[in-house]
């Protein structure tokens, strides 16, 4: 048995591998990530709660493919051009500030006056009757402000988290520090999901104040407006401002004096790299290593998109109005946060003790097991129902899907993100900066958009199709892409080892 002092040191190494001299940098970085992930959790629930009850879960495929993906491409072009002209710090302020400004505009101006800005239902119904194959595009046009909010909420994840925050972190930490810092950063950051879920549940549980009606109808009242959406958006904007403030503190007061934490090589990496847009694109295309990182993200995005659509359709069946949908997603965020923090504690030790390959493989393994169980349950729900009688199988299906979503995303946030970010570190500054910009923004959304393309194509050709009617085809795609993901990880690991030597 180990002496108490040695046992305590071992326990501290597992739970908190951060040295005391590193706390000056680590604490503001962790708080910054907490604020950013709080916004991510809240925005993820808000965007789904707007579009699914009012337009149907099938609309998500069209939003991701026809709106989110083009927006990501446009943003990437603008970002690469800005990175050649502006300091990264000012780019960060400009981008985050733009997001926060739009959220305020949506909550306080567009949403309360949506009856003025949106076309009337009679006109929309007539258009759908005349052009049934285009009904999903017509529905998007009927709620264009919801679609715009969906785009900005999706871009928050791709841009602010995957691109801005992690690129900043990769410029600061080398591979050795990343193994210790990234899992703990993620663990603390995911507490933001728990806080976001609690905020959503708090505001959506006010049944004694308003009836549980569709939010679009209840928002004819300005008092309902302030009770539900505006306070949540105000908290989101406040968290964003705090994140920008912490970012400024790190740049102005910590990095300049942090030679004990950052070596000279990493300090120099904060300098700006000039690279033309065409050269950047060629650099990405000709790099097999960057291509494999992109394929990791594409596989994950496609598989999650394929599973989430049927799951959200089931949630709508159980919670057809927006307030109840928000409440459910709030509870989902709470359990997601708890699961993520738990996985972060486990994941940090897996990464440090078992290495990159095992850590990277655990996410697809987790997703394949839980996803397969969910698909089988949905496909054979009637057969399963004969064994349980009058039991609420719809509720069980939603819980099975929620468990799948929570476990797969928990392993993704704790292991996939950390291993993916570590894969960038051995690269040159040019590949790390410009390559990451394209891979993170376009790659992230291309995976989801590929799944969305498959689904939306079916819904366009067969207007009466639903997720229940195409579930077996989604299962086949799920199995094929899962095998491709695992094969790509094994190949990428060999190249990663060579670069680290």
From Swiss-Prot:
* Single GO term (MF): ATP binding
Q: Coiled-coil segments, which residues? A: none
Q: Which GO terms describe its cellular component?
A: plasma membrane
Membrane-spanning parts: 23-43, 59-79, 90-110, 146-166, 183-203, 227-247, 293-313, 326-346, 361-381, 383-403, 446-466, 470-490
Keyword set, alphabetical order: ATP-binding, Cell membrane, Membrane, Nucleotide-binding, Transmembrane, Transmembrane helix, Transport
Question: Which compartments does it reside in?
Answer: Cell membrane
| Membrane topology type | Multi-pass membrane protein
This protein's major location comes to membrane
- Among the Pfam families in the record, one is TLC
Q: Among its keywords, does the record have Nucleotide-binding? A: yes
InterPro entries with a match to the protein in the record? ADP_ATP_car_bac_type (IPR004667)
Please give the superkingdom of this protein's source. Answer: Bacteria
State the protein's purpose. Answer: Provides the rickettsial cell with host ATP in exchange for rickettsial ADP. This is an obligate exchange system. This energy acquiring activity is an important component of rickettsial parasitism.
**Which family does the entry's similarity section mention?**
Belongs to the ADP/ATP translocase tlc family.
Spell out the protein name for this chain.
Answer: ADP,ATP carrier protein 3
- Organism equals Rickettsia typhi (strain ATCC VR-144 / Wilmington)
Gene symbol of the encoding locus: tlcC
């Amino acid at each position: 048995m180990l002496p108490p002092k040695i046992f305590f040191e071992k326990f501290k190494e597992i739970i908190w591998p951060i040295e005391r001299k590193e706390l000056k940098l680590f604490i503001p970085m962790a708080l910054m990530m907490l604020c950013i992930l709080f916004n991510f959790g809240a925005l993820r629930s808000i965007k789904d709660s707007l579009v699914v009850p009012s337009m149907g879960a099938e609309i998500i495929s069209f939003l991701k493919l026809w709106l989110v993906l083009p927006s990501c491409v446009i943003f990437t072009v603008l970002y690469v051009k800005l990175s050649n002209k502006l300091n990264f710090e000012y780019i960060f302020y400009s981008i985050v500030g733009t997001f926060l400004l739009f959220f305020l505009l949506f909550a306080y101006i567009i949403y309360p006056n949506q009856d003025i800005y949106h076309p009337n239902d009679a006109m929309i119904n007539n258009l759908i009757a005349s052009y049934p194959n285009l009904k999903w595009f017509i529905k998007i046009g009927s709620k264009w402000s919801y679609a715009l909010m969906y785009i900005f909420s999706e871009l928050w994840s791709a841009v602010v988290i995957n691109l801005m925050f992690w690129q900043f972190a990769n410029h600061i930490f080398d591979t050795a520090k990343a193994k210790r810092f990234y899992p703990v950063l993620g663990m603390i950051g995911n507490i933001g999901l728990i806080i976001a879920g609690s905020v959503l549940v708090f505001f959506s549980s006010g049944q004694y104040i308003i009836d549980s009606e569709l939010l679009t109808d209840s928002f004819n009242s300005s008092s309902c407006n302030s009770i539900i959406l505006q306070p949540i958006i105000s908290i989101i904007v406040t968290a964003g401002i705090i994140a920008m403030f912490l970012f400024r503190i790190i740049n102005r007061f910590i990095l300049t004096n942090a030679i004990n934490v950052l070596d000279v090589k990493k300090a120099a990496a904060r300098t700006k790299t000039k690279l033309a847009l065409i050269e950047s694109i060629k650099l990405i295309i000709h790099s097999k290593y960057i291509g494999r990182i992109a394929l990791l993200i594409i596989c994950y995005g496609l598989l999650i998109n394929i599973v989430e659509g049927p799951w959200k359709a089931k949630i709508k069946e159980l919670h057809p109005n927006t307030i109840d949908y928000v409440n459910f997603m709030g509870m989902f965020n709470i359990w997601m946060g708890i699961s993520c923090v738990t996985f972060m504690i486990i994941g940090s030790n897996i990464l440090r003790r078992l290495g990159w390959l095992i850590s990277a493989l655990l996410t697809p393994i987790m997703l394949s097991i839980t996803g397969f169980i969910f698909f089988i349950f949905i496909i054979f729900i009637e057969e399963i129902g004969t064994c349980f009688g009058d039991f609420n199988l719809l509720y069980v299906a939603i819980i099975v899907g929620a468990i799948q979503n929570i476990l797969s995303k928990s392993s993704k946030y704790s292991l996939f993100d950390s291993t993916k970010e570590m894969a960038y570190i051995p690269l040159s500054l040019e590949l790390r900066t410009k390559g990451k910009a394209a891979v993170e923004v376009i790659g992230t959304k291309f995976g989801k958009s590929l799944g969305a393309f498959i689904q939306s194509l079916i819904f366009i050709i067969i207007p009466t199709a639903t997720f229940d009617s195409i579930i077996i085809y989604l299962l086949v795609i799920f199995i094929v892409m899962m095998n491709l993901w695992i094969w790509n990880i094994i190949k990428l690991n060999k190249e990663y080892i060579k670069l680290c030597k």
